[in-house]
Amino acid sequence: MEKHFLIGLAFLVTLVSCHERTDKDISNKFIGTWTLVRCIAIQQDGTISFPYGEKPVGQILYDTKGNVMVEITNQEIKKFSSENPFLGTPDEIIPAYNGLLAYYGKYKILADSSIIVHSITASSFPNWVGQDQARRFEFKNNNLILRTPSISSVQYELTWEKIGKSK
């Protein structure tokens, strides 16, 4: 009886250890800086649009302490007539605001469900401050693909490429 208990206990410890190692392996894949390759909006009918233009730029950074920082911009936005960012006209400010998303906060990975949660501390979109934003993740080659849940009948898919050494 004691022998069976010890064998069962050893199996359980091995199983838990493998699960923890898998979570850590997935966690390590996120660490580093990623550059935005593509950002698309997918309507319910399958129509695709480009909310930050067809050639958006951006970076997402994940560090080992659970911090995340994101910036996405539309490079097609026209420059302001003034060099002072606070003196733009409404015709300059509106597209500039709509062509930018930036936030930072903490992240946690729910490896079993392939979800990463960004807990937002500050954001260019004020409604997200203090919220958790969940993203389904997938690693494909040297890319990280993040998908939002449906937001107003639209799902966003962002493809990021790892900068530097591949993990």
Describe the function of each predicted region.
Residues 18-167:
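Lipid interaction determinants
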Residues 10-17:
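Hydrophobic h-region of N-terminal signal peptides that target proteins for export
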